[in-house]
Amino acid sequence: VDLNTENDYVADYLVKCYGSFIKMGVDGFRIDTSGHISRLTFCKQFIPQFTALGKKYEDKRLNKAPFFMYGEVCARYSDVTYRGQDNLSCYYYTWEAPQDLLDKWDGSQKYWDTQVLFDKANGGTGVDDHQMALCESDNAPTPTSDNTFMVNGKWHEPDYSQASGFHVIDFPLHYNFGNAAAAYGLAKSGDKRYNDATYNVVYVDSHDYGPQQTNDQFRFSGDDAQWAENLSLMFTFRGIPCLYYGSEVGFRRGAPIDRGPHGPLSETGRAYFGGYLTGDVE
């Protein structure tokens, strides 16, 4: 389902639905496939509303911590900038969208009632003539930040004046966990691109992809020493460590992650059942 999240009616409905969980005391959202929604849409439609609800119902959370949101911007690439394009990169979503674009936003029902979106196969564009163009125009280079780093060996107050309030899964770091040295080197050189990389959610592998070795469609296939080094870095480095079920035991090492309709689940890296859960660590 491709929801029209640029329509206020749709966005408000989603906020109402998911806001119910915030009212119950849920302390954060992981938003799947966030890269399919523009940063402008997040900054206009969702982040402000969810943040406000989080503040309003903070007493429902046990520790009253700020409501936390992070998303999956799936950038399967070895560099922190995805194919040379800022607006397709994970870090882009951690920065606030330009105010001049936010001011031009019109998601009202009155606007959408004027739009007739014919399918491309029938000669139409398949998109509206304003909101889509507005989202695509949000492609300016991002600033850099020292929020992650100490300055002259000392802690300093971070500057969040340009932060979007949204955080991301650290896909570039995940992709470089073929070995810990590569992951560490990438973070040292690339963390300045995020508003604050200490809030990046870090995992070595997941149910979707393994770290880049020769093919990310397979579970990690290295030895125990290499795996232990990766996990040690994940738990002691900057960011929020995220352990996918099975990672701690080298689950289904080297297995293809997903065969789709071409083979049984038992032959994949997603065989989360029965004896498969014992893992392969000696």
Predicted regions and their residues:
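Short glycine/proline-rich turn/loop motifs
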Residues: 1-6, 24-25, 204-217
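Active-site-adjacent "subsite" loops/lids of carbohydrate-active enzymes
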Residues: 1-24, 34
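A broad, structure-centric signal for solvent-exposed, well-ordered loop/edge residues
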Residues: 10, 210-211, 256
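Active-site-proximal helices and loops of the catalytic beta/alpha 8
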Residues: 16-19, 27-196, 200, 217-225, ...
